[in-house]
Amino acid sequence: MGKGKNHDRKANPGFGKVKSKSGTSTGEFTLKRVKGENFYRDAKSAARVKMLNGGKAVRDRDGKIVEAAAFQKGEKEAEPGRVKPDRRWFGNTRVISQSALDHFRTALKEQKADPYSVLLKRNKLPMGLLQDDTKDSGSRPHIVETEPFGDTFGPKAQRKRPRLDIGSIEELGESSAAAATAAEAATAESQANGTADLADIYHPTTSTAREPIYAKGTSRRIWGELYKVLDSSDVVIHVLDARDPLGTRCKPVVEYLRKEKAHKHLVYVLNKVDLVPTWVTSGPYAYAYANGPARWVKHLSLSAPTIAFHASINNSFGKGSLIQLLRQFSVLHSDKKQISVGFIGYPNTGKSSIINTLKKKKVCTVAPIPGETKVWQYITLMRRIYLIDCPGIVPVSAKDSDTDTVLKGVVRVENLATPAEHIPALLERVRPEYLERTYNLEHVEGGWHGEQGATVILTAIAKKSGKLLKGGEPDQEAAAKMVLNDWIRGKIPFFVAPPAKSEPGAPTAATAAAATTTEAEKKKTEAEEQELAEERETMEILEEQERSLGKVLGIKRVKGVEQPISKIVTMTKFIGDDARRYVEEEEVVDQDKEMVEKEEEEEEEEDEDEDEEEEELAWEDVFPEEADAVDGGEEVEESDKEETDDEEDVDEEEAVPSAKQLGKRKAIDSDEEEQTANKSKRMTTNKQKATNFYTHANVKNRNRDRKVPKNPGKRSRGDDETTGKKAKKRR
């Protein structure tokens, strides 16, 4: 039997060689294998299994630990050691004197009270010692120190029973009734003196069970979204409704930010300023009396920076000021790559609309109904500024009734079972003249009040709008829903007046305007002028200090935010004293008129320059000689018609001049006069061009700039082609 070619193993040394395990052969790159690692588990999963299973230490029969368990400190780590001798062990550590503590405490208190100071970093100081706890010192009752537990209860009690103010249910009822009467008397007195909080005027307390629909914005999910936004944002913008700023302010959230998140900056944005008169938002200082109404921007600026805003993608107000303020914050936080700005507030206050206005496009879904935003959303404004949209939140308050919740725009009106029950409270807040004008109702002496007045006005509105039930009965619930929707969307004029500077015995604005100025009033005005001068001096000194500090530190300084609030265009028309509740001085009025006239003239000049730029250049305007040559020959009649059309259009424009053109005819240059003279020489006929409705009407917005067509003498397409051919031939 012959042998095969592979039969001789000595001849083929590589035949039958067994593959060795990885890492056993010398000179081969090996990895350190973990105990337990095999085909089924890698090193990570093996370590995890070892952690889960190896929770016990290995001990001998005497109970001593032979092998410590995982995550268990052994005896070797706790061996006694020798401390290295050093003089620093006996020296002073970080110490501070009481005088320095008092100085830091007063400085910190002043900076905390200033809403425009920004906390960037906390130094290595004992902040617990620096914070002033005088307000909270008496908050905790020291019961144990006053009466120890052993002296009150137990075998060594010194009295038989605890001292209780109320011993029965009858005494509890009497005490609660007395407390209620005392609270009512206190609120009535505060309202009479004018010291009551405006947010408490329409907020009676209630103890009845509420329907689930009135608990919108208070769910655990929405408040979880709020805390996500607060934790993620460096700047928190609280959006308020200009019609009721204090009513739409989330006081618990503001207090939480002040106490727990002092390093986050709070800014108020007063949205929907186009729905209130300009004097409510703010106004020139010359119009404000010492006892006149304080504007909302000035009032809210005492607690935080406040900006008036009107959210609109095309016609907005306050957009530049808000972006400038956000850029200031980004400059302050120059050590960060970017800052996040969170928008919080009540539902339907315009948070998403403000973000769309800043982006100048629709990036957030918006609707005139509350609850459109469900979850938080990140939007990139620019490279270093991010915006965070938050769903609307409603802080739980015992002062808010169901009607207050509805009138603040928290609840969707179509989901209300009985919307007519909220109309009496609405009638108390709105003047009857506005309802008559909005719904075209007949004038009623004294207006509508109470449930009876609500029934009367709802019946009239239902009949006017055709909302009837079977048998021709007016549908009051449908009419109430319509009124509430108009209220929420701003069609019914309403606003809460800003707080006035109330002083005991001070005269009102009307009496002050009518009466002659006394010596006391003169002293008051002089004192106010001195205060204003001192404030200006201090502001100048602070600005100089900021400039010098910026030069030293090399920090880029950004200008302050200013707003021309007097230029806000109000959408709703208010009556008489609502439109302007301050008395204007004659000199101030004259100055304002001059300023307005100058601004109007500048705007007119800019508009005229834009119109001249927008006018299309014709061929004859650039090459008049060639145009005359082209117009000769076969196209004489057509050119004559075009010339007459041009002249007739000019005549029509001169016959019906606009207000801008009347004031500008004196400023026509001599070159323009020569051009018009040259054009008038070319007129050869008096034929009138036929006109119709579409000549002057603005159909499909094509003729929006002028009453006459923009270029009535423009050649047709065939004419352009012929002139083009002739021009080619000439060339």
Swiss-Prot record:
Function: GTPase that associates with pre-60S ribosomal subunits in the nucleolus and is required for their nuclear export and maturation.
Main location: nucleus
PANTHER family recorded: GTP-BINDING PROTEIN-RELATED, NUCLEOLAR GTP-BINDING PROTEIN 2
Gene designation: NOG2
Entry annotated with the keyword GTP-binding: yes
Chain residues that bind GTP: G345, Y346, P347, N348, T349, G350, K351, S352, D389, C390, P391, G392, I393
Region (Disordered): 1-27, 130-162, 517-541, 585-731
Biased composition (Basic and acidic residues): 132-145, 519-541
Family: Belongs to the TRAFAC class YlqF/YawG GTPase family. NOG2 subfamily.
GO biological process, one term: ribosome biogenesis
GO MF annotation: an example: GTP binding
Domain CP-type G: 223-396
Ranges of biased composition (kind: Acidic residues): 597-655
Biased composition (Polar residues): 685-698
Gene3D superfamilies for this protein: 1.10.1580.10, P-loop containing nucleotide triphosphate hydrolases
InterPro entries, A to Z: G_CP_dom, GNL2_CP_dom, GTP-bd, GTP-bd_ortho_bundle_sf, NOG2_N_dom, P-loop_NTPase, TRAFAC_YlqF/YawG_RiboMat
Composition-biased stretches (Basic residues): 699-715
Locations listed in the record: Nucleus, Nucleolus
Name used for this protein in its record: Nucleolar GTP-binding protein 2
Cross-referenced CDD domains: NGP_1 (cd01858)
Lineage top rank: taxon: Eukaryota
GO terms for cellular component: nucleolus
Keywords associated with the record: GTP-binding, Nucleotide-binding, Nucleus, Ribosome biogenesis
